[in-house]
């Protein structure tokens, strides 16, 4: 359904994610200078990016490649490009139907535009309850478990110790409210993203001569053109399905989480934040997920083969160790943990 909506929104907006792609970057970079009672567009962008970027970019990509083969990465790209239009629409709606709270911050999101736009308070409350349950309990457990397993495999730290540390770090930030969360993500997200991308680029440059083979495997696997590149279950459907599923899990376009952060921004026009949040989908999947995928595929059959039995998070660690030895364990763990 989310892929179908992405196609509909792409057609309806005449490919806004392609037509205004350069303008998105200009708006995002320029928004760092904003001042206002609510959050700046850049702060709202980093809050959204902190939610998107995390274990989905590591464990999610790894699982997509294990189950769907190299071609799954191609379908993650397609889903992300379509998802940019979905993200644009949901974030723009969040701005249109937002309300000003007593704390001076703007509040909005799907629950608000379901109530105020569709006139259904009941469905708005139901959506809000489901969102709180999903993002308050389920998704944090997935993220935290991946982090705990990484620390356990790299340093032998018990899972329960990592859990306590994560709680101790998170509580002061959350108790400070949205402004404190935004202040932290505004500085932390760019730094950690740059570190991850730099290490990824170093890995790619070390294996630059093998990059054509990686792209060949991705495109051949995406369309079932070569035997041995399909994942568990085999066939083109397994590749497409797993790529799309993991792509949506990673970039969260259309899931209803991003608009809540988008609504908090002070912008001159609702479309401005829609464009900026749309860029987050691109950064998450086309850039960060691709880096993880390239590092795994560049490691070759000694580390990765489609359909292999290996924990998804461990695959990324094994690939990084293959390229950069023990540095990779520290890098992967430390760059993932802050996003939780």
Label each region the model flagged:
Residues 14-46, 223-253, 259-275, 279-282:
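Membrane-embedded helical hairpins/re-entrant loop segments and their flanking transmembrane helices
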Residues 27-49, 80, 91, 95-135, ...:
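Transmembrane-helix boundary/entry motifs in multi-pass membrane transporters
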Residues 9-10, 52, 62-68, 94-100, ...:
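Helix-loop junctions at the membrane interface of multi-pass solute transporters
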Residues 89-98, 199-217, 228-231, 264-265, ...:
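Extracellular/periplasmic helix-exit of transmembrane alpha-helices
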Residues 1-55, 65-72, 83:
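N-terminal alpha-helical transmembrane segments of multi-pass membrane transport
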Residues 44-106, 116-120, 274-301:
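Membrane-interface helix-loop-helix modules in multi-pass membrane proteins
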Residues 330-336:
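Conserved small/polar residues in nucleotide/adenosyl-binding loops
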Residues 5-25, 145-151, 158-219:
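Membrane-interface loop-to-helix entry segments
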